């Protein structure tokens, strides 16, 4: 088990050795608390865009379903006639320059897997740059936009925001509720009281402190041909290789099991880079991966490689609340 996997396991299941990391946790908290205090005091170089900025972020390390929810938000806003742009750090991307406008025909190594997925699915203008303020300014210089969505960036306080949404995995929760490196939290748990909404991925109903949303499998899409099939294409009991290089691979594997398939699971690091050799398994079976992984594998995909497309389905209460916020933020 890789070190990151062992840490995740300890954060969410407990381990006595984590107490040794608490002095480092105290130092980490001092730094993040200081950054937020400067932001609240209006100190430092803080950029406020001329259009509303909505941050869709995490307080924990690991995947929470951000990309599908952002895609839902894009589509929902576009149906209301809003021109939407997205900014992202572009984790793992190596563009020729920064900020960098992501195009659908670029490689994942150039654009980053999640930004490329968002552009290929939605067609929205998207700029990557670790400096999100600079990304927003470049995006607004290139396109007339009504709204900016920030893919993550909850802790990027140089960018002023009008709305903060935090996603939490309903099954894993906040782990041991401690900050890095003694726990999975990027900021102290008290930070959640200051955000505008919590969304629980996988919750079956809204909670007192937040809204529910689920990820619904919508189709199987062949990496090589683009052929689209319903999820019933594979019968119940179908054995297949399952590949996931995301923040929480087990959630993807659980989804496949929920479709009554029999996955042979292969978990990779988040944002992993793939090769034919890395994805050649025995016995020979169809291979199903996440859409985020698929954007990195199309160039060398075999005929029986598929990805499972999923759509975010937020609760009616969240949709109503979000519409109210859009109305409030409208000029």
Curated annotation (Swiss-Prot):
<dbReference type="GO" id="GO:0009245">
    <property type="term" value="P:lipid A biosynthetic process"/>
</dbReference>
<keyword id="KW-0808">Transferase</keyword>
<comment type="similarity">
    <text>Belongs to the LpxK family.</text>
</comment>
<keyword id="KW-0067">ATP-binding</keyword>
<dbReference type="GO" id="GO:0009244">
    <property type="term" value="P:lipopolysaccharide core region biosynthetic process"/>
</dbReference>
<dbReference type="InterPro" id="IPR027417">
    <property type="entry name" value="P-loop_NTPase"/>
</dbReference>
<dbReference type="GO" id="GO:0005886">
    <property type="term" value="C:plasma membrane"/>
</dbReference>
<dbReference type="Pfam" id="PF02606">
    <property type="entry name" value="LpxK"/>
</dbReference>
<comment type="pathway">
    <text>Glycolipid biosynthesis; lipid IV(A) biosynthesis; lipid IV(A) from (3R)-3-hydroxytetradecanoyl-[acyl-carrier-protein] and UDP-N-acetyl-alpha-D-glucosamine: step 6/6.</text>
</comment>
<dbReference type="GO" id="GO:0009029">
    <property type="term" value="F:tetraacyldisaccharide 4'-kinase activity"/>
</dbReference>
<keyword id="KW-0443">Lipid metabolism</keyword>
<keyword id="KW-0441">Lipid A biosynthesis</keyword>
<protein>
    <recommendedName>
        <fullName>Tetraacyldisaccharide 4'-kinase</fullName>
        <ecNumber>2.7.1.130</ecNumber>
    </recommendedName>
</protein>
<dbReference type="InterPro" id="IPR003758">
    <property type="entry name" value="LpxK"/>
</dbReference>
<keyword id="KW-0444">Lipid biosynthesis</keyword>
<comment type="function">
    <text>Transfers the gamma-phosphate of ATP to the 4'-position of a tetraacyldisaccharide 1-phosphate intermediate (termed DS-1-P) to form tetraacyldisaccharide 1,4'-bis-phosphate (lipid IVA).</text>
</comment>
<keyword id="KW-0418">Kinase</keyword>
<keyword id="KW-0547">Nucleotide-binding</keyword>
<dbReference type="GO" id="GO:0005524">
    <property type="term" value="F:ATP binding"/>
</dbReference>
<feature type="binding site">
    <location>
        <begin position="60"/>
        <end position="67"/>
    </location>
    <ligand>
        <name>ATP</name>
    </ligand>
</feature>
